[in-house]
Amino acid sequence: ALSHAVANEKPNVLFIAIDDLNDWVGFMGGHPQAVTPHMDALAKRGRNFTNAHCSVPVCTSSRVTVMSGIGPMTHGSYEIGPKYEQLPALAKAPTIQRHFKDNGYFTLSGGKMLHHDFKGRLTGDVDQSLGRKRSPRPKKPMSRPANWSGAWDWGAYPETDAQMGDIQLAETAAKALKEDFDKPFFMSVGFFRPHVPLFVPPKWFELYDEEKIALPKNPKTDLDDLPKNFLTINDYAVAPTHAQVVESGKQRSLTHAYLASVSFVDHCVGIVLDALKASSHADNTIIVLWSDHGFHLGEKQHWAKRTLWEESTRVPLLFAGPGIKPGKPCREPASLLDLYPTLVELCNLPKNPRLEGLSLVPQLNDPTAARDRPAITSSYFGNHSVRSRDWRLISYADGAKELYDHRVDSDEFRNLAKDPEHQAVIQRLAKWLPKKAAPEFKPKSERSRGRRK
């Protein structure tokens, strides 16, 4: 079995996070023109989890969940919200970095890992910082309409890769991989793109012919069979509405910028993977690549994240390294909550009893091994999605439901929740809906303001 293959010598871990990366990568087939050779090569030599989902479809809470191994129903962060160290439920919960450090690992981290970085009582979780540099932005808006949020801008900028924070991080990580360590290492590398603003150098835009870029299918009647509450949940004030994007005439240009940013970050991943391959650590390093949540580019007439639909919850998830045989993708439901327990088992560390995910080692050994629980995603308080191998059930706080059959409707165009013949499926999936939920935790600074609409 896999865990024994690496039991003699503790393997290193290269833990790569990418912000806002959806399935528009070659190895997931979400966009037919996506150019991602480095990640595709990684997928070929490891295990590609094609049905992996975040626990919360927004940066802060998703990352707190990954790093703690504890879900939102326990820690109480359901949106942008509080820092890891502010959550009372996580007061004694070690980050994955801390757990590895406490068990003999040297920890390095750079870029965006936790949304608010390793600060306060988390400062000591990381032995060596790889830095967290920002990329330059133009002084004036390049592409965004005047009535859009400032972050929603895009274009071919700056001139060279060397100016980009993600490239600087990749090169710092690559340099660190040349070193010899006197103990196994856990290296966390967090890339920012394709998070907005979608500025990357011109050469990444030149990979695509804007006029020929395929746009997502978007039937005008797509939202007609949805419960009314979905509108309030999915109204994400920071992002433009689909109507605004279409009216502005910018959909194709914005889609182009996202694809260019994905190809750029693939190059950054390649710099790190090439450095690992050339290093003395090549044969003894487990690689994990993941994104904190998905991203809509007009699908279901929505932009950005926070929804409980496939585009928001589904994430790339790859494992490769010693003992992980290349093979078929795994279609069983996986959750980002499963990363922490999987790595603990692969590296033969003592278990952290508070972890709420389930190890993916059985699926690393055999991609067809069944999993006995679906992936649960929650957005805001009281709204949940249950994603099994073939189905997605969404249940809103007011009791309204959506049901999609992914065997025939991967775009989630047809809501089956009201069909009499599907009530048994709903009942079966509804058993997984969280029964108890920690109240939403708001730090004192936010309580007076209430939720941003």
Feature annotation, model-predicted:
Residues 1-396, 400-401, 410-453:
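Formylglycine-dependent sulfatase
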